[in-house]
Amino acid sequence: MKLGVPLVCLLLLTTCCRFFKGDPYKNTPVSGTTTIAVDETFRPVFEAETALFQAIYGYSEIRTKYVPEKQAFKLLLDDSVKLIVASRQLHADEISTINSRKLFPKQLLVALDAIALIVHPSCKDSIISMKQIRELLGGKITDWEQLNSKNEKGTVRLLFDNEKSGIVAFLADSVCRGNFAVGRASALHNSREVIEYTATHPGVIGFVGTSWISNSNDSLHLSFHKKIKVLSVSEYDQPTPETSYKPYQAYLLDHRYPLTRSVYLINAEPRSGLSSGFVSFVSSDKGQRIILKSGILPAVAPARVVNIRPDL
């Protein structure tokens, strides 16, 4: 019986310590475990976001599923995850499905991304028009000579990361508006495979998210991976170097680069738990700086402190 009191005291002390230090088993905005689904085209950005979040909050564990965008929405609608990262917002019927479970999703714009067109470094073309892109995707243009009379004759092969990806959905819905000849295109498993294949196969045009090809060693984000060539895109039917733009952050901001899309965090968590905490982190100054460094455009410009010397 004499051991009872010390044992109770020890249990109370342990409980108090866990309360003050953070309970690793309790789901709060900064602790616990959650599973999220991220469109694979945003993987480089959110690998960095989750890594820093978990480094700061040691009792947090974010299990991330990098999947095609269609699968991410299915996981959310099936109640398998409470948070997804996607390039579009929920449709009305999808919101109704989630509402039927007494859940009310919040959708937050956190970044602007771009779809880059990449080719083999030996490709003679450097610019392409939106009209030509639509005709490529619609099957009207099938040969390199149709893009540029200086090109050697040969079939243009279109390459995507996955047939269910957000890139394919964006091109089909927002660019082609339904006139999308998917039979001519090839799909691999992920963006990394698209880059590797395009870098070693002339005659291919690959479609990838900009964060996959951004040169992390370039602090100004004015260059891309040297293993591939990035095409400049023009809104004009007769493109010129002066009217064509690469997916640099400045051209995402003013929408001069035409293939710009949004990045949303869609959170259906019933109360403020770890998923909600991660959403807050991504939209915070730290989270937005990670997005800025990745080569795409943060929705909120991170604060920048500048020291002004009085003697200047």
State the predicted function of each range.
Residues 1-15:
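Sec-dependent bacterial lipoprotein signal peptides
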